[in-house]
Amino acid sequence: MKRSRCRDRPQPPPPDRREDGVQRAAELSQSLPPRRRAPPGRQRLEERTGPAGPEGKEQDVVTGVSPLLFRKLSNPDIFSSTGKVKLQRQLSQDDCKLWRGNLASSLSGKQLLPLSSSVHSSVGQVTWQSSGEASNLVRMRNQSLGQSAPSLTAGLKELSLPRRGSFCRTSNRKSLIVTSSTSPTLPRPHSPLHGHTGNSPLDSPRNFSPNAPAHFSFVPARRTDGRRWSLASLPSSGYGTNTPSSTVSSSCSSQEKLHQLPFQPTADELHFLTKHFSTESVPDEEGRQSPAMRPRSRSLSPGRSPVSFDSEIIMMNHVYKERFPKATAQMEERLAEFISSNTPDSVLPLADGALSFIHHQVIEMARDCLDKSRSGLITSQYFYELQDNLEKLLQDAHERSESSEVAFVMQLVKKLMIIIARPARLLECLEFDPEEFYHLLEAAEGHAKEGQGIKCDIPRYIVSQLGLTRDPLEEMAQLSSCDSPDTPETDDSIEGHGASLPSKKTPSEEDFETIKLISNGAYGAVFLVRHKSTRQRFAMKKINKQNLILRNQIQQAFVERDILTFAENPFVVSMFCSFDTKRHLCMVMEYVEGGDCATLLKNIGALPVDMVRLYFAETVLALEYLHNYGIVHRDLKPDNLLITSMGHIKLTDFGLSKIGLMSLTTNLYEGHIEKDAREFLDKQVCGTPEYIAPEVILRQGYGKPVDWWAMGIILYEFLVGCVPFFGDTPEELFGQVISDEIVWPEGDEALPPDAQDLTSKLLHQNPLERLGTGSAYEVKQHPFFTGLDWTGLLRQKAEFIPQLESEDDTSYFDTRSERYHHMDSEDEEEVSEDGCLEIRQFSSCSPRFNKVYSSMERLSLLEERRTPPPTKRSLSEEKEDHSDGLAGLKGRDRSWVIGSPEILRKRLSVSESSHTESDSSPPMTVRRRCSGLLDAPRFPEGPEEASSTLRRQPQEGIWVLTPPSGEGVSGPVTEHSGEQRPKLDEEAVGRSSGSSPAMETRGRGTSQLAEGATAKAISDLAVRRARHRLLSGDSTEKRTARPVNKVIKSASATALSLLIPSEHHTCSPLASPMSPHSQSSNPSSRDSSPSRDFLPALGSMRPPIIIHRAGKKYGFTLRAIRVYMGDSDVYTVHHMVWHVEDGGPASEAGLRQGDLITHVNGEPVHGLVHTEVVELILKSGNKVAISTTPLENTSIKVGPARKGSYKAKMARRSKRSRGKDGQESRKRSSLFRKITKQASLLHTSRSLSSLNRSLSSGESGPGSPTHSHSLSPRSPTQGYRVTPDAVHSVGGNSSQSSSPSSSVPSSPAGSGHTRPSSLHGLAPKLQRQYRSPRRKSAGSIPLSPLAHTPSPPPPTASPQRSPSPLSGHVAQAFPTKLHLSPPLGRQLSRPKSAEPPRSPLLKRVQSAEKLAAALAASEKKLATSRKHSLDLPHSELKKELPPREVSPLEVVGARSVLSGKGALPGKGVLQPAPSRALGTLRQDRAERRESLQKQEAIREVDSSEDDTEEGPENSQGAQELSLAPHPEVSQSVAPKGAGESGEEDPFPSRDPRSLGPMVPSLLTGITLGPPRMESPSGPHRRLGSPQAIEEAASSSSAGPNLGQSGATDPIPPEGCWKAQHLHTQALTALSPSTSGLTPTSSCSPPSSTSGKLSMWSWKSLIEGPDRASPSRKATMAGGLANLQDLENTTPAQPKNLSPREQGKTQPPSAPRLAHPSYEDPSQGWLWESECAQAVKEDPALSITQVPDASGDRRQDVPCRGCPLTQKSEPSLRRGQEPGGHQKHRDLALVPDELLKQT
């Protein structure tokens, strides 16, 4: 047809090449009357144009006018003859395709269309064939184009007169079009087209009538820009398109052959297709354009007008489909075929998980494209993004897999891209925005000219920039070579091939040794395993095949594997490999040590708002990452949020996840969001009932919004402690979810407004209105996160840092053995895989594992080559640039070292970077991990290395130990330390890493370093601060002289305020997954791994100072100081050099006055009481190695005495030995212990928390004073990591949580106990913080029912709670102030929890644990270990016990024990207060016990009330009891006391309360920290008065907690006494000044003032410790009875506990409370003198005089808190008992005064 029409055209393209639209148009034109034929001029033009050639054909398709256009224009009635001519012309031009010549009149739209190479090539040709005739258009073109276009004149010739006619025709048609336009698209006001309708697309129906002037917004611009841009001649003028305005359009493009598209003749059609019409000419009324206007070829792209996005998309798609029906249909058909043939369901799953995930995504993208195409929603932008995502997935495939299956994925992606290529090109042409392109081009041109100094001409530059000069074939060849599987993926791997070989080794179950069960789930169990060759720890999830097959969920297992393998995000658990065995599908993932958030909530209740913010923000980032990849988790809940060793979050468990479509920004329009919210229509209701979204329950289809609903539930649970919807059955629960309103806590528990608002928006019933549905950005912008640095979350210090006892410590996890039993599945028959071929594809190995494994292999090879195994591989060797400070890697450990140096490097660097960000512990973690790797001794392999570390030291200044302030390096490791530990034993390593801050204390033996080996303490903070002002001088010289080993540099190291890890710590492999033993893929876990933390210990500590005793003197006096955690009342006992005799051995050795003692003989001393430290020193013989750090380097600040020191609770290190606890008890309590410890680490003070984190992660030796020091910046908590608070929290397990009121700020106390204390500390802190919005009265906030999970009987390590470790510790660590009482019953529940629990979980949690059972357990615990000590509410004790005056003796006794054993009163040992006889105390205690037992029943009913009312009292009472002198403290007390105390823990817990008003009489001026509260199990002397008994009881309860917390206390009370007696002289020598500070007991009885110590308090005090003597037990019982009092005392116990909680046995908590009564040091690290000081003056009680450099002491106010000091009130609260204050005052004598008096 066309042929006949274009009779002049020599070579018409075959009709079959034309689009239907073109053919139809041709037919129409045929049918038109002859007059419509193109005028002769037009025909001539066509003749001139010549045959179209192949290009023409190709273009034919592209340029074919849209059928719609033709239909509209083809109606003869509608179109005038001019229209006829125009049509004809267009058809003829279509045939000709005018490729050879560019008509000036060609429409730009046409030009835009062809994007093919032919188009580009045509662009290159700018030759114009002259058309014989010139029309107005031609003239116009000439004029407007100016001379910028190379051959404009030639183009003029081509212009034929017919155009004029076409103009008229156009104008007519224009008006017609307006009326008849069927185009669905809205008019485009911006259409730039001038009236040049002849060629202009202006007429296109798609645009409203071009006549409207509004359409010509560009007109003025057009007129002014007569010139085409200078680049006009460039073929690169775009994609051969013109800009809408003349200025913008390039002469080239307009004159290029591109413009001669088949539909060129019909400007109207083009106009219809183009978005912008040339604004250059405004049609006159007749529709004619003035000749001045140059006909612009218009872009076919839809106008970028203000039309709404959706309508614009629809319009463009209509145009597109009308114009290219075949292209669209073909694409849809091919897409459907592609999807059906390649669906993951239709092919065997890929063996490689990452590739399998990518496979899913490619298919999902194809589905989405098909959907959009059918819905008319496709845009070129969509194609761009689709292509980008496909390329991104391809890149991911290459990066994450070395499998041969990459080829399959590549092929898949190529197929899809080919399918969408042509439609994408066509749409690109249609939508091309010339103006936008022009501006971009102009900018590029300017940039090229100015910035790049381009020499070549701009056109060529642009062509090259556009990639038009490249040879695709050549590039393809290069790509194929690059992508070949032979190419090693790891650029940084030195032996690429070597690495690839091991990577081919498929993992199997035989490669791993199972260590223990971590947890059970519905489908299988998770085990802690260790890779046999690499020695790395992993978590192996074993899923029973039979279960999967029976449930037809094999595919789901593959989905989980794919997601875990593909995901690479610091907040998502990563998988290393997977394989199948006879019975199981196994997935080996990184091991995240800290347990899950559900267990944390269970143990401590609602979290502090700051902690919630961090956890939630990290989860939001994890979710954002997953959603961006189309992953819908579907099972978000606290159980699946794991806590890394650094305290950060990792999301896990993708067993129910679905893989949907990757996020596309083009999908953000309303319609798609709605579709996205119903992405899955499987009607499946899956997930955990409490977290299932309403749309899932209603089976309305669901999508990503379900995860945001679950996030809302999680946020509520974090803040409140329980889920918002409860039900006895899923149906009931679902009913509430769908219809019930959320109940918000009110009053004190009210949530912060922003938190409540965020929660309510996340819990919106309508998924479309739910926050997060649009994107995670919505959530991140919420005011709740104001001020949050989303990019630095990993750098933030976490408040809760798990304290691991060993590398194999899984105590933070609940095994759930009672619910699931998968262990038996091993015996099941083998699963026949005949029907499950796909299962065989399950085995895969991620690049992570390959790299690690290959690294290990290389390491081992290197090892073999190297002769000295110890240095087998040094990081320096691996990479000189590894400034991490790993000078050498221990050869032996290398095998289990992180793996390849690159991995190590990455880990370290990651930890360094991410941890740098989180300055605190992460670096420690890194170090710890590395520590295993590095041999400390090896570090200084050579002088250069040493020098390198040293060179940093100079910055440090004096102490080598100090970490370079700027650098993350914890500090150089002393050479000798390295020597001492040439190799780190795995065991030691595990221990140290496990110990975390507590580790040091816990395993003193472990941390025992050779003299020189003492870990150097480095405090980045300190460094930053005053840089050893004390250290300057010779000591500096001496220290610097020591060669320093490189230490792994970790930013976190710097973060550690005071990192005093012992080298032993360093070896702890406990490290996190990163630990050599554990592999953690992500920086977060890596960083968090505790082992890493220990590493810093290697180099961080400065070399110990070796002091050789001269005669009987060491020549220095040490003093115990109270270091409060921030503003809390929890303090930890630290020891400082109070005085150094000039010319004495200490002075000669370089010991400096005012330095903080971190280690004695390699054993951390923070948290130890004074007597224990003295004993350590005396035990060392003629020489002692003392590690010190300048106080300035710590975060400890000296401040005035605290008025409320009597409330202070000492955070104790738990001394508990693993053996004692036994695996089971440890499991049970370890979680709590950890939590408490961490909680303590969390110390309220942020700085403390950060320190703690680093410490805990770094050294986290539970008892390690060092740790506390390192934490000091954060809080002494580490040192005190002590359990007081932790204990408190532990005590309540939930108690802490349950009694937020016990906001033991110093969870530090909790830190006393390694784990529990941290939990406790956390709980108090959490409560405090939690309160913050509603925290104000944290004490009063009842723990959430969850939090309340019945607290195991306080100290009883009630097996019920595996987390009970906290509770176990509770007794020891709870400061009375904490009001552990609430913890006891967990009765403190948030007011909400007080309500009858709605949730089964609440009920479960609240299920009362019989008080008696708890007591029994607690008593056992107490007896068995200090850790487990009963916390008796002091108030109860007070009630039980008749008010008694606290005999000064008692108070003093506690302290005196500390001060020195056997020391005469004159020597500073407090004598028992005459006021009470031990017998009386015992009687009181027995009575108490009975009363407690009686009260137990009552308590169950009244517990909540009691908790709220008595909690404080009880806690105080407990404190008093706690204050009971410890044997160690009151050594002066008859040795018998000591012996008795010996029954209990050797040292009473050092809770100041437990210590009672021990006179800070330091035997030698060295104030021993308050003795551990733990007292011998045997009854102790009781203070004469019943109060004393009460106090004793409480102290016993509290003391036990303290004792527990003071796990590190090495000396039993008896031992302490003995040691004290034996070394009294030595002590005296040590602390010549009698004014040593008694660390914990602030109060000493007045008698103590007199200096007379009686044994009385000892016994009770001793009993106070974990080990409860029978009498103590009785006392504890009494304490329980007094629990009510305690509750009263302890605001922490809200009255509004849920009945359940009330029912909970508070006594156990009370004992814990008692422990809590042991006052937690406030976070501010202030030393307070012991009770003796308290005796001095009441106010002094508030703060023990902190021995300033000046030497004065602060009195420990805690005396009041000391049970002994307080009269009837065991409670520490001074205010409670008027007399108590006075007594406390008496007791509060400064140690010096006390000593003098004594």
From Swiss-Prot:
Keyword Metal-binding found: yes
Organ and tissue specificity: Abundant in the testis.
Enzyme Commission code(s) on record: 2.7.11.1
Main location: cytoplasm
UniProt GO molecular function: ATP binding; magnesium ion binding; microtubule binding; phosphatase binding; protein serine kinase activity; protein serine/threonine kinase activity
Cofactor: Mg(2+)
Active site: D635 (proton acceptor)
Record field: compositional bias (Polar residues): 172-185, 197-210, 233-244, 992-1009, 1685-1696
Top-level taxon of origin: Eukaryota
Domain PDZ: start-end pairs: 1104-1192
Every AGC-kinase C-terminal domain range: 786-854
Residue spans of biased composition, Basic residues class: 1204-1218
Residue numbers carrying Phosphoserine: 66, 74, 148, 151, 209, 290, 874, 876, 895, 900, 1032, 1256, 1337, 1364, 1447
Compositional bias (Low complexity): 245-254, 1072-1088, 1240-1273, 1287-1312, 1408-1417, 1588-1598, 1627-1654
Keywords from the UniProt entry: ATP-binding, Cell membrane, Cytoplasm, Cytoskeleton, Kinase, Magnesium, Membrane, Metal-binding, Methylation, Nucleotide-binding, Phosphoprotein, Serine/threonine-protein kinase, Transferase, Ubl conjugation
GO cellular component annotations of the record: cytoplasm; microtubule cytoskeleton; plasma membrane
Modified residue annotations for Omega-N-methylarginine: R1004
Protein modification: Phosphorylated and ubiquitinated. N-terminal ubiquitination leads to degradation of MAST2 by proteasome-mediated proteolysis. N-terminal phosphorylation appears to be a prerequisite for ubiquitination.
UniProt xrefs under Pfam families: DUF1908, PDZ_6, Pkinase
Protein residues bound to ATP: I518, S519, N520, G521, A522, Y523, G524, A525, V526, K541
Biased composition range(s): Acidic residues: 1503-1512
Catalytic activity: L-seryl-[protein] + ATP = O-phospho-L-seryl-[protein] + ADP + H(+); L-threonyl-[protein] + ATP = O-phospho-L-threonyl-[protein] + ADP + H(+)
Subunit and partners: Interacts with CDHR2.
Function, as annotated: Appears to link the dystrophin/utrophin network with microtubule filaments via the syntrophins. Phosphorylation of DMD or UTRN may modulate their affinities for associated proteins. Functions in a multi-protein complex in spermatid maturation. Regulates lipopolysaccharide-induced IL-12 synthesis in macrophages by forming a complex with TRAF6, resulting in the inhibition of TRAF6 NF-kappa-B activation.
Identification of the protein by name: Microtubule-associated serine/threonine-protein kinase 2
Native source species: Homo sapiens
Gene (name only): MAST2
